[in-house]
């Protein structure tokens, strides 16, 4: 999967993965993580998610990473924020209040870039990536952020019934990808097929969302 794939998705507004409301799993489970109010939270592959504002509204400093400059600019425009723009290594950084969006390749992110981040929120990052890239993503994420707490949201369905993205990432893969460095605990599992017409149309017969708590070992 090449960067152009995502650039075209954003340019053509094919962004069915974007949620028009704050994610309910985030609202339900984040408070139980006991993450300090002023903690810095890393949000990989963040798009223009409203979850960024929700996290900032709880007092957190939010560092989102997004490949598409259109997504980043749309976020600030739609939220009526005027960001300051600067360069940081390979990234173009947009800052407004407690939100920083780093526009560039997630795999270029370094440990120094995320210094101070003690929390992680992944709703649509790992499931956006095909298998080989998921391996790279998990390894890179754990190398730059070995000690953290946070939430991961995944989808699980029969991948043979529909091509991704979003891709299916089952519980065994979550444990294999992340369990060697972090403690990974499933908090919730929901059957969401009835709410997902795209999947039904494609012939998917089972669709589950899972929410995991992540803690550095």
Swiss-Prot record:
Pfam families given in the database record: TPMT
UniProt signal peptide: none
Enzyme nomenclature, EC number: 2.1.1.67
Catalysed reactions, semicolon-separated: S-adenosyl-L-methionine + a thiopurine = S-adenosyl-L-homocysteine + a thiopurine S-methylether
A GO MF label: thiopurine S-methyltransferase activity
Major enzyme class: transferase
Binding site for S-adenosyl-L-methionine: 10, 45, 66, 123
Gene3D superfamilies documented for this protein: Vaccinia Virus protein VP39 (3.40.50.150)
Cellular component GO terms, alphabetical: cytoplasm
Assigned keywords, A-Z: Cytoplasm, Methyltransferase, S-adenosyl-L-methionine, Transferase
GO biological process, one term: methylation
Subcellular location: Cytoplasm
Family: Belongs to the class I-like SAM-binding methyltransferase superfamily. TPMT family.
Xref: PANTHER family: THIOPURINE S-METHYLTRANSFERASE
Alphabetized HAMAP family for the sequence: Thiopur_methtran (MF_00812)
UniProt name for this protein: Thiopurine S-methyltransferase
Organism annotation: Pseudomonas fluorescens (strain Pf0-1)
Lineage: Bacteria, Pseudomonadati, Pseudomonadota, Gammaproteobacteria, Pseudomonadales
């Amino acid at each position: 999967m090449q960067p152009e794939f995502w650039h075209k998705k954003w340019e053509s507004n094919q962004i069915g993965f974007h949620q028009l409301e704050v994610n309910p799993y985030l609202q339900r489970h984040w408070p139980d993580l006991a993450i300090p109010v002023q903690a810095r939270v890393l949000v990989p592959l963040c798009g223009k998610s409203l979850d960024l504002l929700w996290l900032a509204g709880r007092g957190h400093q939010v560092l989102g990473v997004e490949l598409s400059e259109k997504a980043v600019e749309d976020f600030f425009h739609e939220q009526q924020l005027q960001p300051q723009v600067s360069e940081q290594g390979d990234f173009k950084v947009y800052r407004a209040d407690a939100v920083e969006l780093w526009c560039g390749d997630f795999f270029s992110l370094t440990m120094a870039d995320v210094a101070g981040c003690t929390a992680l929120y992944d709703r649509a990052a790992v499931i956006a990536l095909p298998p080989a890239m998921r391996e790279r993503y998990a390894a890179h994420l754990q190398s730059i952020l070995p000690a953290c707490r946070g939430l991961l949201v995944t989808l699980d369905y029969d991948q043979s019934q529909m091509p991704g993205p979003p891709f299916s990432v089952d519980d065994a893969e979550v444990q294999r990808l992340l369990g060697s460095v972090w403690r990974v605990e499933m908090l919730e599992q929901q059957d969401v097929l009835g709410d997902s017409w795209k999947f039904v149309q494609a012939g998917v017969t089972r669709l589950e969302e899972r929410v995991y708590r992540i803690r550095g070992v």
